[in-house]
Amino acid sequence: MLIGSHVSPQDPLAAAQAEGAEVVQIFLGNPQSWKAPKPREDAAQLKAAALPIYVHAPYLINLASANNKVRIPSRKILQQTCDAAADIGAAAVIVHGGHVADDNDLDEGFQRWRKALDQLQTDVPVYLENTAGGEHAMARHFDTIARLWDVIGDTGIGFCLDTCHAWAAGEQLVHGVDRIKAVTGRIDLVHCNDSRDAAGSGRDRHANLGAGQIDPELLVAAVRAADAPIICETAEEGRKDDIAFLREKLNS
């Protein structure tokens, strides 16, 4: 079970070595921008490296939106991100589920997701990540994810489970792993994060493991059950300890 972290994109290989990470995740551009990622001078080096590198797509992406000024740029930047991810030999691109205007629009949001995936041209796997809050979200609650998966599950899309997000959404972690696997057939990646807030808060505020509201042993049980590569999206100070903690617990 590979354990690593979300690191600065400046030098992912050096960051991985410094943190003892066996796998990393990076942004390829500004996560709050519609601008396409710039070509990387080290693309060939990253592609040749043995280190698995995951890419997180920009936060602005909302493939479910009925608003053309949001949905169309979302499709475009996802394609551009996948193209840039292919250039570095990325293991996958992770994207949030987005949301619609009201619950009556959920089914239409599912179909917009389907259309976006059908139009996407990439050999890089794309993983849907569950989200912490937001009204009328595509991927906040596992029941909604199941409905979405009925529409997009045969496209080859994968799933990334974020423990902080599941906690914030009020979902049970270990039982939630079983529920998600029953829907998707597998979990492809885990974002193992503690939460600064109470269960069901809807707030997406990560904490280092043991410094938040989630019992560290519960996190260990969840990632063990998920049986997938692990990325800690926690604060840089303490992240090396997060990796070491998980490695000790999961290898014992």
Curated annotation (Swiss-Prot):
Zn(2+) 2 binds at residues 129, 162, 191, 233. Its EC number is 3.1.21.2. SMART domains: AP2Ec. PROSITE patterns: AP_NUCLEASE_F2_1 (PS00729), AP_NUCLEASE_F2_2 (PS00730), AP_NUCLEASE_F2_3 (PS00731), AP_NUCLEASE_F2_4 (PS51432). It catalyses: Endonucleolytic cleavage to 5'-phosphooligonucleotide end-products. Binds 3 Zn(2+) ions. One of its GO terms (molecular function) is zinc ion binding. The keyword Lipid biosynthesis does not apply. CDD domains: AP2Ec. It comes from the Bacteria. It holds the Pfam family AP_endonuc_2. Zn(2+) 3 binds at residues 165, 204, 206. Zn(2+) 1 binds at residues 56, 96, 129. Its cofactor is Zn(2+). NCBIfam families: nfo (TIGR00587), PRK01060.1-3 (NF002198). Belongs to the AP endonuclease 2 family. This is Probable endonuclease 4. It comes from Mycobacterium marinum (strain ATCC BAA-535 / M). The lineage of its organism: Bacteria, Bacillati, Actinomycetota, Actinomycetes, Mycobacteriales. The gene is nfo.
